[in-house]
């Protein structure tokens, strides 16, 4: 893990990557491509120290409400999120400024923020997308060695009623 300060975080397509890099180790991951100009090992997570402040500035300046997307390049619920809480801080800002949220993850850690995701959905809209590559636990550990197990994901689905 290494830390950095960023000048911007919200893309022109309204996407954010709270972290840069990922520890899931998925063998098929496109985000490892050199075209994304990452100058460090993909597993060496870049923590954007000022992510929430920069996001707040960007949300304050937006003229129209929209859906903010996260998780496309780096899972917002990597192991470090438990300690750092940057994803929760950013989601709180998205909620307080009245934006919708579309979030992709492979982690059952998203359950920690279920209260906030429900609030966003009640106010605007929240879409949660969880990847299910295979139900075969042994195969999963080969192709996605550090993601939540399928049984953990299935348990999270059973524990959480639909947002709408």
Residue ranges and their predicted role:
Residues 152-164:
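Single conserved hydrophobic/aromatic residue that forms the stacking wall/gate
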Residues 1-129, 135-138:
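Conserved Radical SAM active-site core
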Residues 139-143:
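Short acidic, glycine/proline-rich loop/turn micro-motifs
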Residues 146-152:
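Glycine-rich S-adenosyl-L-methionine
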